[in-house]
Amino acid sequence: MKSIEVHTDGSCLGNPGPGGWAALLRYNGREKELAGGEANSTNNRMELMAAIMALETLTEPCQILLHTDSQYVRQGITEWMPGWVRRGWKTSGGDPVKNRELWERLHAATQRHSIEWRWVKGHNGDPDNERVDVLARNQAIAQRGGLATS
């Protein structure tokens, strides 16, 4: 089974507003960057999309170390999801789970992989997190119709 390192991030200019997501996949010294965006989104949706797109890109089962600065994504997939499913996609307070379609898609994308979800503090000097942050922000800027920066 291939061992892949993944770094993800999402960005939103306003919340809601133009959003971007990005992922960096690393395997055997090779890297692949993925990025995209939506004209009207939220930060949480973009964080979810980054993880979804990274996992859906992989064509075979992999051992994955996935770094995210989103506690929403990490806790959602590792802690909250079993309860949501058990309660018919309701939160512990009885409300419908937000972004359910993305959570279902993320859950499906995780099934063939062995994944360790690792939280990294955002904007704290981690070079890979900073890299995907810039990529995601540039996608959000492009969705707004602005010029991306490096």
Swiss-Prot record:
<dbReference type="InterPro" id="IPR022892">
    <property type="entry name" value="RNaseHI"/>
</dbReference>
<dbReference type="InterPro" id="IPR012337">
    <property type="entry name" value="RNaseH-like_sf"/>
</dbReference>
<dbReference type="GO" id="GO:0043137">
    <property type="term" value="P:DNA replication, removal of RNA primer"/>
</dbReference>
<feature type="binding site">
    <location>
        <position position="9"/>
    </location>
    <ligand>
        <name>Mg(2+) 1</name>
    </ligand>
</feature>
<dbReference type="InterPro" id="IPR036397">
    <property type="entry name" value="RNaseH_sf"/>
</dbReference>
<comment type="similarity">
    <text>Belongs to the RNase H family.</text>
</comment>
<comment type="subunit">
    <text>Monomer.</text>
</comment>
<dbReference type="InterPro" id="IPR002156">
    <property type="entry name" value="RNaseH_domain"/>
</dbReference>
<keyword id="KW-0255">Endonuclease</keyword>
<feature type="binding site">
    <location>
        <position position="133"/>
    </location>
    <ligand>
        <name>Mg(2+) 2</name>
    </ligand>
</feature>
<keyword id="KW-0378">Hydrolase</keyword>
<dbReference type="GO" id="GO:0000287">
    <property type="term" value="F:magnesium ion binding"/>
</dbReference>
<protein>
    <recommendedName>
        <fullName>Ribonuclease H</fullName>
        <ecNumber>3.1.26.4</ecNumber>
    </recommendedName>
</protein>
<dbReference type="InterPro" id="IPR050092">
    <property type="entry name" value="RNase_H"/>
</dbReference>
<dbReference type="Pfam" id="PF00075">
    <property type="entry name" value="RNase_H"/>
</dbReference>
<keyword id="KW-0460">Magnesium</keyword>
<feature type="domain" description="RNase H type-1">
    <location>
        <begin position="1"/>
        <end position="141"/>
    </location>
</feature>
<keyword id="KW-0479">Metal-binding</keyword>
<dbReference type="GO" id="GO:0003676">
    <property type="term" value="F:nucleic acid binding"/>
</dbReference>
<keyword id="KW-0540">Nuclease</keyword>
<dbReference type="GO" id="GO:0005737">
    <property type="term" value="C:cytoplasm"/>
</dbReference>
<dbReference type="GO" id="GO:0004523">
    <property type="term" value="F:RNA-DNA hybrid ribonuclease activity"/>
</dbReference>
<feature type="binding site">
    <location>
        <position position="9"/>
    </location>
    <ligand>
        <name>Mg(2+) 2</name>
    </ligand>
</feature>
<feature type="binding site">
    <location>
        <position position="69"/>
    </location>
    <ligand>
        <name>Mg(2+) 1</name>
    </ligand>
</feature>
<feature type="binding site">
    <location>
        <position position="47"/>
    </location>
    <ligand>
        <name>Mg(2+) 1</name>
    </ligand>
</feature>
<comment type="function">
    <text>Endonuclease that specifically degrades the RNA of RNA-DNA hybrids.</text>
</comment>
<keyword id="KW-0963">Cytoplasm</keyword>
